[in-house]
Amino acid sequence: MGLRSCTHFATLVIPLWALAFCFLVVVPVPAQTNLQTSKGDRRLQDLESNMGAESDQPNANLVRPSLSRFGDKRNQKIITFGRRVPRPMIPIELDLLMDNDDENTKAKRFDDYGHMRFGKRGGDDQFDDYGHMRFGR
């Protein structure tokens, strides 16, 4: 009779765990996306009202892009388990971050004689005319 009570207990507990999972995980996700879309709508309305206020100025004849095409993708409902990662508006060029000045550093560090330089000519740190330390003096 012990085995029968365990199976009866398991049949009662498993649906309760599934119900708790639904309330804790599945229900908050659409609520979060609805909150994000309402914030996006509010920002869009603020931008459109600012654009309407600026249209009274003399620069009203300039053609401005419609905000509706930018807002369409942002207001789509996407069900995910995490927050959206903000992406920068301007892409970062990785080539600019890399330092590829090997030729310049070699030219600065060594003089024509292959000796390591400690300073430029005419500076206060100058050791002699060639820019390298002479160990004989």
Swiss-Prot record:
Keywords: Amidation, Cleavage on pair of basic residues, Hormone, Neuropeptide, Secreted, Signal, Sulfation. It comes from the Eukaryota. GO terms for molecular function: neuropeptide hormone activity; neuropeptide receptor binding. Pfam families: Sulfakinin (PF08257). The modification Sulfotyrosine is found at Y113, Y130. The keyword Signal applies. One of its GO terms (biological process) is adult locomotory behavior. Residues 1-31 form the signal peptide. It is found in: Secreted. This is Drosulfakinins. It comes from Drosophila yakuba (Fruit fly). The gene is Dsk.
